[in-house]
Regions:
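Non-catalytic terminal/linker segments enriched in charged/polar, low-complexity residues
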Residues: 1-138, 144-150, 168, 172, ...
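P-loop/Walker A NTP-binding module and the surrounding RecA-like catalytic core of P-loop NTPases
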Residues: 129-132, 137-346
Length: 346
């Protein structure tokens, strides 16, 4: 029997043929009940359409248009503040964040004697950036090798896709990556992660069924043996109300610590921006269970309102590590408070 975490042997029938520019799939996860390594070669980078800020503005256009449309008048009056308050609440900012922003905006307008809607618009951008600033935190993997990122989230939030995009971003920082297919119950999840591994040219540790904690444990040891910089561990999607599944997440975190007593070095929850205030409830639940160190907010691509970021800042300021604005492989970037505020208000 081969050792766990080592590449599986394949016979002629199980090997895939090489095609031009493609990598060889050393072993297919569904052929073995043991953890296997899927090795892929990194393909050439594809050009990214448009600047990141432009894509972010397009993604937040719905809320941005509502907000900027309020500043077309000629005076700053009580009606303008009331309209701003309604627009922020409609954008999923929530009552706490909205009240904080409006109070700060009123105080700033008085102090700086702002008398034009354009001046108030600029002040709103500055106050929004200040509110979101605690969510912005530099992401660095120095000090740990491998640096282990545990990723959780509800079904359909874009977790596996975000992992694939994150791997690409990390490669752009000259870091090597290994993916752990910790969702062992859904074959589609493993196949999706393997596809991202092939697309990025990174190895994937996978297993058909079995204990997800064991797969991630093996992945950490495989990464250490290979000298890999970062391990990203996928986990099965679950609702915070599924208490037994939340307990499983806690177990996975404990097992990761057995592989490396300093790990996981990051524990992230992936959120769908389209879920609005429900995303805030997810943050609270996953944070209470796991002690989150970061968030990934996905699907800011034109239908989401984006105000939930302000709600998170006001009520549960877990750092927002990355945001995603589309389906492209480069459509995931580190969160920048000032940039996000400009995209909403400019």
């Amino acid at each position: 029997m081969k050792r766990s975490g080592q590449p599986a042997r394949t016979n002629g029938a199980s090997k895939r043929r090489r095609s031009t520019g493609d990598s060889l799939l050393e072993s297919r996860a569904h052929l073995s009940p043991f953890p296997v390594v899927l090795n892929f070669r990194k393909p050439p980078d594809a050009p990214s359409p448009g600047s990141w800020l432009d894509r972010l503005k397009r993604g937040l256009k719905k809320t941005g248009s509502q907000l900027t449309g309020l500043f077309g008048g000629t005076k700053v009056d009580e009606q303008l503040f009331e309209d701003l308050e309604s627009a922020l609440i409609s954008a999923d900012a929530g009552l706490d964040a909205t009240r904080t922003l409006i109070e700060r905006l009123r105080a700033r307008a008085r102090k700086e004697r702002i008398e034009t809607p354009q001046g108030l618009k600029e002040a709103l951008g500055a106050e929004l950036a200040a509110l979101l600033a605690p969510l912005e935190r530099p992401f660095a993997v120095a000090g740990h090798k491998p640096f282990v990122i545990m990723v959780a989230g509800v079904n359909g939030a874009g977790k596996t896709t975000s992992i694939g995009k994150l791997a690409k971003w990390l490669q752009g920082q000259n870091l090597s990556v290994l993916l752990a297919a910790g969702d062992t119950f859904r074959a589609a999840a493993r196949e999706q992660l393997a596809a991202w591994g092939e697309r990025n040219g990174v190895a994937v540790i996978a297993q058909d069924g079995g204990d997800p904690a064991a797969v991630i444990f093996d992945a950490i040891h495989a990464a250490r043996a290979r000298g890999v910089d970062v391990v990203i561990a996928d986990t099965a999607g679950r609702l915070p109300t599924q208490l037994h599944l939340m307990e499983e997440l806690k177990k996975i975190k404990r097992v990761i610590a057995k592989a490396d007593r300093t790990a996981p070095h990051a524990v992230w929850a992936v959120l769908d921006a389209n879920t609005g205030q429900n995303a805030l409830a997810q943050v609270k639940a996953f944070d209470d269970a796991l002690g989150l160190t970061g968030l990934v907010l996905t699907k800011l691509d034109g239908t989401a309102k984006g105000g939930v970021v302000a709600a998170i800042a006001a009520q549960r300021p877990v750092p927002l590590a990355f945001i995603g604005v589309g389906e492209g492989i480069d459509d995931l970037r580190p969160f920048a408070a000032g940039e996000f505020a400009r995209a909403l208000v400019d």
